[in-house]
Design a protein with these regions (language model features):
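Domain-level representation of secreted and single-pass membrane ectodomains enriched
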Residues: 19-172, 177-180, 248-252, 392, ...
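Sec-dependent signal peptide recognition
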Residues: 1-7
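Serine endopeptidase catalytic core focused on the charge-relay Asp
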Residues: 110, 120, 130-194, 198-200, ...
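C-terminal subregion of chymotrypsin/trypsin-like serine protease catalytic domains
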Residues: 208-209, 256-258, 326-334, 344, ...
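Short, small/polar residue-rich loop motifs at catalytic or cofactor-binding pockets
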Residues: 199-202, 344-348
């Protein structure tokens, strides 16, 4: 399955001179294949089956649908989305489409087929499924981009597969429940295909407040810009783990961001149609204490867009590394650490925890496989210290950042 792709960074717009930034090729991780659709749903034909396939012809393991209501009509209605067996997966309401130009993405819908049914409305009501992002089974190929040995030593958080078959210890469940996959679908650059082509990707992130999600700045995707399109098409799934509970969110606001520290803090809200499966999130604890080389750590992530994984029995290698935008350390600030937790594309934004389950760093870069004058080859993974992120936000005079300091108790 080809749910992962490695972007050629030379083809992407850059927010900083490429020669001054160490950015390996794993920054953008493909997740799902876009299929343009034009499926009308009216009272005269209120129910339609949707069966998108991946680029290589596989049936989808899950999908997201892009839905519009060009004419919502005058009467209330709802749109029920059910799986092959008739289980209700999501329900959208007329109020989710405030205007005829409104479109929205559903959350992740499991299964190879869904049925979309219009309930209510009037003769003028016209809803349209405009596209689907179809994802095949999770990719478990061992690509070997940023791992220490011949095979990755991460394992499924809940089952322990494929290595030890021992689940993670119970005291790590609370931190794990705050970790989720970030998935986005936006219009692709013109060079990527015909008009209307979309591109999708995944990252990892973690809840640091009741409705605040922390991930990497570069997880804004190919445009490297947290604009309205990226925000509007994103979904965050805190239960991408084959579990029974749906915990999916959309992004309402980018509260804080910084390229040098490669972080973005997103304010989130329950995704349309997903309210019934969402409860208040329980954020992680954060530690800004000094980090020491050799310190024991673990990382929870979605490498290769797989269900929730854990990389443990790993350690901090260096506690003093310059920022990715200052690879030679000219600015003097040592805002990053290096570590040996196995990672792959999709783990960008993954939280790194100390043995007490406190968030100490945010993973953002893997091994530097290709050398450049500014960036020599290395075999270390990199993460941004939470102390650096906290210091940056607390030092800002921006009223929005000062309000964030109060909200987070920093």
């Amino acid at each position: 399955m080809r749910c992962i792709w490695l972007a050629v960074l030379a083809l992407l717009p850059s927010a900083a001179p490429a020669q001054n930034v160490c950015r390996p090729s794993e920054l953008v991780t493909r997740f799902g294949d876009w299929k343009a659709l034009s499926i009308p749903i009216r009272l005269s034909a209120p129910s339609q089956d949707i069966t998108p396939k991946t680029r290589d012809g596989q049936l989808a393991a899950s999908m997201r649908l892009l839905i519009a209501a060009p004419n919502p009509g005058a009467k209330p209605w709802s749109l029920a989305i059910r799986d092959r067996d008739g289980h209700l997966l999501s329900q959208l309401e007329r109020s989710d489409f405030p205007s005829a130009s409104s479109t929205l993405w559903t959350g992740r819908l499991t299964g190879s087929m869904v049925t979309v049914t219009l309930r209510g409305g009037d003769a003028d009501t016209f809803v349209e499924v405009r596209g689907a992002s179809a994802s095949g089974p999770p990719n478990s190929d061992q690509n070997g981009f940023s791992i220490s040995g011949a095979t990755a030593q991460w394992r499924d958080f809940y089952t322990g597969a494929p290595h030890s078959h021992a689940p993670a210890p119970p005291n790590r469940r609370d931190p794990a429940e705050a970790v989720g996959i970030f998935v986005d679908d936006t219009l692709a650059p013109a060079a990527a295909g015909p008009p209307g082509t979309r591109t999708s990707w995944c990252c990892t992130g973690v809840m640091i407040g009741r409705n605040l999600y922390l991930t990497n700045w570069h997880c804004a995707g190919p445009k490297r810009l947290w604009d309205g399109e990226v925000r509007g098409n994103a979904v965050i799934d805190l239960a991408w783990e084959n579990g029974p509970i749906r915990r999916q969110f959309s992004v309402s606001e980018v509260v804080a961001q910084n390229e040098d520290l490669d972080f973005a803090i997103l304010r989130i809200q329950p995704a349309a149609g997903a309210d019934g499966g969402v409860r208040t999130t329980f954020p992680v604890q954060i530690s800004t204490a000094p980090i020491s080389p050799g310190q024991s750590i673990y990382m929870i992530h979605h490498a290769q867009c797989q269900p929730k994984l854990i990389s443990d029995n790993c350690h901090v290698q260096s506690a003093s590394r310059a920022a990715w935008t200052d690879p030679l350390g000219g600015a003097g600030a040592k805002t990053e650490i290096t570590h040996d937790c196995d990672t792959e594309p999709g783990a960008s934004g993954a939280p790194i925890f100390d043995p007490q389950g406190r968030l100490i760093a945010l993973h953002h870069l893997g091994h530097q496989k290709a050398a450049s004058p500014m960036c020599p080859i290395d075999n270390v993974n990199k993460a941004v210290k939470m102390s650096a992120i906290s210091d940056f936000i607390r030092a800002s005079v921006d009223p929005k950042y000062q309000a964030l300091v109060v909200e987070l108790g920093w």
